Amino acid sequence: MDASAINNLFLIGALLVAASILVSAFGTRFGIPILVIFLAVGMLAGTDGPGGIVFNNYPLAYLVGNLALAVILLDGGMRTRVSSFRVALWPSLSLATVGVVITAGLTGLAAAWLFNLTLLEGLLIGAIVGSTDAAAVFSLLGGRGLNERVSSTLEIESGSNDPMAVFLTVTLIAMLASGQTGFSWDLPIQLVQQFGLGALLGLGGGWLLLKLINRMELATGLYPLLVVSGGLIIFAITTAVGGSGILAIYLCGLLLGNRPIRSRHGILHMLDGLTWLAQIGMFLVLGLLITPHELLPIALPALALALWMILFARPLSIFLGLLPFRAFHDRERIFIAWVGLRGAVPIILAVFPLMAGLPNAQLFFNVAFFIVIVSLLLQGTSLPLAAKLMRVTVPPEPAPVSRAGLEVHPTSQWELFVYRLGAEKWCIGAALRELNMPEGTRIAALFRGRELLHPSGSTRLEAGDLLCVIGHEHDLPALGKLFSQAPKRGQDLRFFGDFVLEGDAELAAVAALYGLKLDGLDGHQPLGRFIAHEIGGEPVVGDQVEWQGLTWTVASMEGNKVRKVGVRFPEGSRPGPGLFL
């Protein structure tokens, strides 16, 4: 390759990335998933598009896909809070194992019949498309305001179900290549090895990487590079010894993100950019790899297979996988079933048969690609509507307009939060000394217009003020309530109910206030504990139960404890005046 060809490669690559970014700004206005846009740009630049680029280098696509997926999972792990495991760990693991097997099996049976394949070939297609995609889930769920049980289950499932799909795919390819027709008893051992080594090396390697980062004094910009390179080392070593590198790098990120670490905000900031670049690069390459005219002959059976998987196989796997977990409402199960987003992982797995030289390998690849497109277009675009219909969203927590880390010491967790005060804020007109600031927080600066004020305790806040507060992440809920908008009738109150009660209130007192019958219940127990017991499992904000003809909604949580409960009366009923006290 001469200098001119290299320069042209740089130019084409930069143009494709820039085009993807610019087009995505228009596409998102029409509700088109951003990953579909990246994929479409790659297809337009490919063989059948105006770009006419011929790209059929499957090993390179495999390399790019795995590298991008590793970066995406590392970032996703660092942004996942361990506290979410309280409600979602075991359900997610059930879906990541049993759920994938059921989805792959049912989809494989249908694929064998629709495409006139052998049972093993059909099951291979099922295994290829059997797992949800972390890149798609993290990208499309961000900022949707889903309740914690649903969002955590979907995110942890997508970050941990790829090992099962990879294991099934590799096993079936080996069986087809060797002519083996029966399953070996070694398979469960190999499965345990994949998950066991992935978990052990991911957590162990992550701990060693954390210690190294916190002991090394480097230039600020080098810490993110050390995290990425360390994560990739763990990914590669785990894969080399027969474990799941995908699971290992996700758990590595999870450990790093939930422990005190140097330059946390710098690491997350750079990882955010790298993750976007990884998603763009991965979907561009996969878009270049496909030849659209080859999809036309298989369009009808592939569409039928996609609909079978979306409407039957995935929902059945969800309902069976979540059967032991009674805290999940049917509407939550339906929504989780619908958000079985397929993305880059099935396409990457579909490269495996091509690299192994299996018969019908191109068919497997084309079918997987078609299913991914249908999934992103159908499920991705309808996600906001599905969330609304299934009532799995909750009012967003008030958040600062910006936040930045303060490197006071190597593992400092101090942050600077910036709040813009609108006219509807509770605190407008209040003197600074009157603010009930959370313990350990301080007002660092107050801007009015373009001027930096020198505030005193008597300074009164005005609409439009910019308030800078120093605190910790755990102070955000209290600060949000302090500087949040005054709730308008019909917004948050409409969601949580007509009134919001303290979770510590005695059940007997609440029953007396509303004229309810306890029917032998312990009246001395707190209302929050009673509601949590009625929900079953671990409660989250937005959980609802019906009791005594009223709807009771968890309005606020503090750790595992229900702190506030909303109550809604039936339409047309008129609560007594005592309720307004």
From Swiss-Prot:
It is a multi-pass membrane protein. Keywords: Antiport, Cell inner membrane, Cell membrane, Ion transport, Membrane, Potassium, Potassium transport, Transmembrane, Transmembrane helix, Transport. Its main location: membrane. It catalyses: K(+)(in) + H(+)(out) = K(+)(out) + H(+)(in). GO terms for molecular function: flavin adenine dinucleotide binding; potassium:proton antiporter activity. The keyword Membrane applies. InterPro entries: Cation/H_exchanger_TM (IPR006153), FAD-bd_PCMH-like_sf (IPR036318), FAD-bd_PCMH_sub2 (IPR016169), Na+/solute_symporter_sf (IPR038770), NhaP2 (IPR023729), RCK_C (IPR006037), RCK_C_sf (IPR036721), Transptr-assoc_dom (IPR005170). The chain crosses the membrane at residues 6-26, 34-54, 58-78, 95-115, 122-142, 163-183, 189-209, 231-251, 280-300, 303-323, 334-354, 363-383. Pfam families: CorC_HlyC (PF03471), Na_H_Exchanger (PF00999), TrkA_C (PF02080). Residues 404-485 form the RCK C-terminal domain. Belongs to the monovalent cation:proton antiporter 1 (CPA1) transporter (TC 2.A.36) family. NhaP2 subfamily. K(+)/H(+) antiporter that extrudes potassium in exchange for external protons and maintains the internal concentration of potassium under toxic levels. This is K(+)/H(+) antiporter NhaP2. The lineage of its organism: Bacteria, Pseudomonadati, Pseudomonadota, Gammaproteobacteria, Pseudomonadales.
